[in-house]
Amino acid sequence: MSYNESSQIKYWMFNNEGLKKLREQCNNQHKQVILEKTPSSEPNILSPDDELSLIHYYETKTLEIAMALNLPDKVSAPAIIYIKRFYLKNSIMQYGAKLVMLSCLFIACKTEDNHLDIDYYSNITKASPSDITNLEIIILESLNFNLIVYHPFRPMYGYILDINDNSAIYNNTNGVSPIKFDTLWETCKKSIQKSLFSDCCFEFHPQIIALACLNLNWDGFNMYCINNNNNNNNNNNNNNNNNNNNNNNNNNNNNNNNNNNNNNNNNNNNNNNNNNNNNNNNNLLL
């Protein structure tokens, strides 16, 4: 399935106002539950901003745990985005962020086929296996079972590979720093990780986020865009020329066919006339 047909673009893209509205709705719904159950006139209730601050804290902890366990970016990125999506439909006052974080990271490991032993994971994170797994169904239902996440790491890797393959163009340009694949990748990766702690994943497509991070970290970005634009224009011109050539060939073939048909028709008419003349001559002889 392509990104344009994915559940991410269909169900998980919002603007600022939409995100704010969803978070306020979740907060208000659980606030009413607390007020009904708490006799105190002034119960401790978190505001939407308070909840967002706590969620942000546990998103950063997710990355720390993933790095401690040597989990790849393809696991940590979906885990963080699962947490974000979960708390668009649920309040942190209803489901504690620590266990949600641990469950989301464990789900991401399974989704990305990166095996993680539950007992080992439980021992490292100081949470019981049942605490980690009990929330799985609740989280999956809140995510609508939309587990495939398109994150900026993949397009970024592709961009840097393309830059590296054409490094001779950029390395010989004044004002552009020499390209070292590993250095540029690690620098851009840190920017992507920071973007995961914001709402970028809800508001922008992953390839756009990747380009923005590349622009922040590489002074040859503008030249890269111009070069790609020129290549695209050349490809379009070549395609147009090929189409024109094909059209000309088709027209020539059609003209040749029409000429052949006309010649055949003329020959047939001549043959018919000759036959008629012969018949007339025969009639005269009779």
Swiss-Prot record:
User: For this UniProt entry, what's an example GO CC term?
Assistant: nucleus
Keyword Glycosyltransferase (UniProt): no
The record ties this protein, via InterPro entries, to: Cyclin-like_dom, Cyclin-like_sf, Cyclin/Ssn8, Cyclin_C_2, Cyclin_N
Could you tell me which residues belong to the region Disordered?
235-286
Aminoacyl-tRNA synthetase as UniProt keyword = no
**Compartments reported by the entry:** Nucleus
Q: What does this protein do?
A: May regulate cdk7 involved in transcription regulation and cell cycle progression.
- The protein depicted here goes by the name Putative cyclin-H
**Biological source species:** Dictyostelium discoideum
> Which gene specifies this protein's sequence?
cycH
